Amino acid sequence: MKSYSRTRCVLVCAAFIGLFSIFSFRLIYLQAIKHDEYAGLAAEKHVYKQIIHAERGTILDANNEVLAHNIPVETVVADATHLNSQKAIVDLVSAELKLPPAQIAEKLSSERRYIVIKREVPEAQAGVLREKLRAANLRGIYFEHDATRVYPNGSMLCHVIGFTDFDHRGIQGVEASMEEYLHGQDGFRFIEHNRAGQEIVPYRGQERPPRDGYQVHLTVDLSLQNIVENEIDAAMEEYSPQKATIILMRPQTGEILAMANRPDFDLNFRGEAKPEEMKNRAIIDMMEPGSTFKIVAAAAALNERKLRPDSTIFCENGLWNFGGAALHDHRAFSYLSVRDILVKSSNIGAAKLALSVGEQRFYEYIRRFGFGERTGIELPGEISGLIRPPQAWSKISITRIPMGHEVGVTPLQMTVAMAVIANGGKLVTPRIIKSINTPEGKTISSLSPVELRQVISPETASEIGDALRGVVSDRGTAAAAAVPGFTIAGKTGTAQKVDPRGGYEQGKYVVSFAGYLPAEHPEFVGLVVLDDAHTGKPELNYGGLIAGPIFSRVAEKAARYLDLEPHEEIRKAIPVERVEKTTPAERIRKTGPAERVALTNASRH
């Protein structure tokens, strides 16, 4: 009996020891071996990684006028694992955020821990929802501080500024090209919630503060942009063109002072914009420039010293057969000087100028002026245009290209080419970015002018400039581009519109004018392009009669704004109305020699 009791006691003790060992091993397994894993699982139920969004940098004009900034909003998100009453939450959230209940219910039916319910909720509206959730003891809905992008000027400068997507990433314009600087770096913090879903602040964990985006200052002057926008709107109203572009640029530095295109769109309602309205036609549209391109042939002939400005060329009395095809002038000219070939815009004269230097050398000058390559402006989507090498030319190409046919150029390329003449023969990269600053205002990058090459000699540039002054006179094709009190140098362009299916569209033209002011000391180069302007009379559809007057109005108002000094005698005779500036700007005064101001109608070309 005693032996039996002793055996039973041993067995019981062994059982207890075995159970104790099992529980001890299990405890050690959970507390030591699996501690990190289960601690992480437990933390996931109550710890939440909150993203602290960096504020996107502001975009400003040259005078610190705001072009794009942020307004604080909140993003409403849900953690499906924390929801304590899905139906009540759906009813409340749908009512407050004006969302369909079915849409919210579908989102919350998943087991995901991060579900975006609605973005860009105004702070006041988010505050009301937050209080109602707390009062009803509903858990699983959280709020993230965010910002929405606002463009205070609506459609003004829309193609340059661009816009962002829902994730605040730039996808067009400066918003895209300067994304690296504007976006900043998001931060985060780990926060712990109690059973009610409220943050336990003392238990706030690791945190990394955000770095806000940098400020980007443009070279554009909003006051000059306003002048250009008003004039391009007036042109759209008067001529109903399919497309239009106006550019102002400082020739010495390449700074873009204004750039406008039509059609356009409101940056704040970009969801309503059509694809055609969102294109920056200044850099992505390819056109045959017409007679504005004649400056290249004239510059090549003079720079190669094949001819002098007063050398005369026989212009065949308006009709010349070359390579089995006829080339016409808009009027019958006999002998014209090189200067007058530009003044009168002779197609035959321009063709003979190109022939004097030869195909290969002429092609090299075309490329030296920057055609056939991107200008390098800090905007996305720029095209290089189309310039074929001489091997791909036909027998008559050498006579058609000098008059701006058989080539494809962008409006910005044509502006830059005219700036070569205004800048003593130097090709400068166009710029839209002035500087990049920290949010505190410290400059981290100030971009300097980039001179690419000396295209032609200063003497040749001066000779071409003298001829272009004659274009804007009662002898030339652009008398209507004149500005009282100032000398203008410029060139008209009229090109039949290219049909995408081949050939040309009958009765449709691209009219343009490129010029600079004052001719002696240029402060800006301007380009006006209208695609398929409607005049009602085909005989009026010329660059000098349509684009020239638009340039005149833009240039006159820009000269007033910049406080450019007109010639003294004319200034007394014609009072100049002053334009008020919205912000202080550097005032540059230039005085040039007297020259007759043409007020007569231009020749048709």
Named regions from a protein language model:
Residues 68, 194-207, 246-291, 296-533, ...:
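Beta-lactam-recognizing serine transpeptidase/beta-lactamase-like catalytic domain environment
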Residues 1-270, 281, 286, 358-372, ...:
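Periplasmic/cell-envelope proteins involved in peptidoglycan metabolism and beta-lactam response
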